[in-house]
């Protein structure tokens, strides 16, 4: 069985277990154990943004991409982060004062971190695409339905050659 193989073979276990989720009283930590990234980070975008938002900035690091969307009228910002899950990196989410809800985003498991005051504090959604070894996160001053809809609209950027 797979369980027996994982117990006997560290190689099989490493290929199967790319991250561990650790739940604490005030936060959740995702610890990664994947290989170092080779090549460039894939570029993703939110394809269905709330009205008034447009991409303002894109920050590219070897294993991390952050896309900033700005609403010039309201001054509000939406962040889309994509992290390559590799050894030595982790993501930490504060759970103090928020409701944590398990969600499915396009078939992938994740968590939604909801605040009561989403107009002034960010709601956050995160999900993991284990096949591509990526963790996604959106932070925004929007309600539960809107942030989930945005997450479901995240797609690879279409590049023209």
Where are these regions (language model features)?
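Short glycine-rich, low-complexity/disordered patches
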Residues: 29-36, 160-161
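Residue-level marker of positions within ordered structural domains that often coincide
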Residues: 21, 58, 159
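Membrane-interface helical sensory segment of bacterial ECF anti-sigma factor regulators
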Residues: 1-32
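Short, solvent-exposed recognition patches
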Residues: 36-131
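Surface-exposed amphipathic alpha-helical segments
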Residues: 132, 137-161
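Long alpha-helical scaffolds
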Residues: 1-2, 110, 151
């Amino acid at each position: 069985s797979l369980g027996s193989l994982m117990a006997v073979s560290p190689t099989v276990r490493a290929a199967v277990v790319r991250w561990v989720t650790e739940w604490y009283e005030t936060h959740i930590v995702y610890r990664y154990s994947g290989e170092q990234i080779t090549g460039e980070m894939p570029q993703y975008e939110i394809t269905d943004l709330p009205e008034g938002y447009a991409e303002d900035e894109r920050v590219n690091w070897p294993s991390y991409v952050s896309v900033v969307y700005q609403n010039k009228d309201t001054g509000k910002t939406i962040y889309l982060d994509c992290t390559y899950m590799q050894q030595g990196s982790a993501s930490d989410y504060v759970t103090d004062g928020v409701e944590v809800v398990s969600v499915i985003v396009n078939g992938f498991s994740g968590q939604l971190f909801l605040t009561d005051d989403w107009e002034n504090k960010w709601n956050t959604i995160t999900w993991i695409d284990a096949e591509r070894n990526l963790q996604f996160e959106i932070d925004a001053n929007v309600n539960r339905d809107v942030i989930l809809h945005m997450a479901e609209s995240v797609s690879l950027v279409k590049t023209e050659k």
